[in-house]
């Protein structure tokens, strides 16, 4: 296929850009280092888009760096957020800084789409481990998975009348913010 060199060039360039801008010991800003938007803050919902591909390209160490940040730096503030809001487990902030404290935002405290990311990130890295490495990995990161899941379970309420779980008080951002 005559397009193979172009595809290869694009893949190599993309990997270079992602490695140089996104693979670090802290989550990257929403737009990386090229452009500064959203106050240059880390946006945890972007971790999936910016970093999960490293597992597919056989570079899981970059995801482990992020898991270390979740465990060693962000875990305690995330637990405080969940407790302050009346939930179990850990609630990962939407927009943050290197110390993992919530950054000022008129909507960030209400968003939860970043919640499942540490669980999936841990699974992606775990799948790359040998059996001996996997046991240590589970020991090191199982609390992130368990406490994230606890928050997610405590965030919903069971509606017995309709036999379903609901997220109370949730509303779409475009329906609640002034235009």
Predicted regions and their residues:
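Aromatic-rich carbohydrate-recognition surfaces in CAZymes
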Residues: 38-157
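Acidic/polar, glycine-enriched structural segments that form the non-catalytic walls/loops
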Residues: 1-41, 60, 70-79
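Acidic/His metal-coordination segments adjacent to aromatic residues that form catalytic metal sites
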Residues: 26-40, 92-108, 167-179
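Short, glycine/acidic-rich hinge or "gate" loops at secondary-structure transitions
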Residues: 25-33, 137-140, 157-167
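Acidic/histidine-rich catalytic neighborhood
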Residues: 147, 151-179
């Amino acid at each position: 296929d005559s397009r193979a060199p172009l595809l290869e060039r694009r893949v190599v360039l993309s990997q270079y850009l992602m490695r140089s801008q996104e693979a670090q010991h802290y989550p990257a800003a929403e737009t990386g280092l090229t452009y500064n938007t959203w106050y240059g803050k880390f946006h945890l919902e972007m971790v999936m888009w910016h970093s999960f591909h490293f597992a597919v390209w056989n570079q899981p160490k970059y995801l482990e760096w992020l898991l270390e940040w979740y465990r060693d730096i962000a875990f305690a503030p995330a637990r405080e957020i969940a407790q302050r809001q009346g939930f179990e487990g850990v609630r990962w902030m939407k927009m943050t800084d290197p110390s993992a404290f919530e950054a000022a935002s008129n909507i960030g405290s209400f968003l939860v789409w970043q919640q499942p990311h540490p669980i999936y990130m841990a699974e992606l890295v775990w799948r790359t481990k040998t059996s001996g490495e996997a046991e240590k990995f589970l020991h090191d990161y199982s609390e992130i998975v368990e406490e994230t899941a606890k928050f997610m379970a405590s965030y919903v309420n069971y509606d017995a009348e309709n036999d379903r779980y609901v997220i109370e008080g949730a509303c779409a951002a475009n329906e609640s913010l002034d235009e």
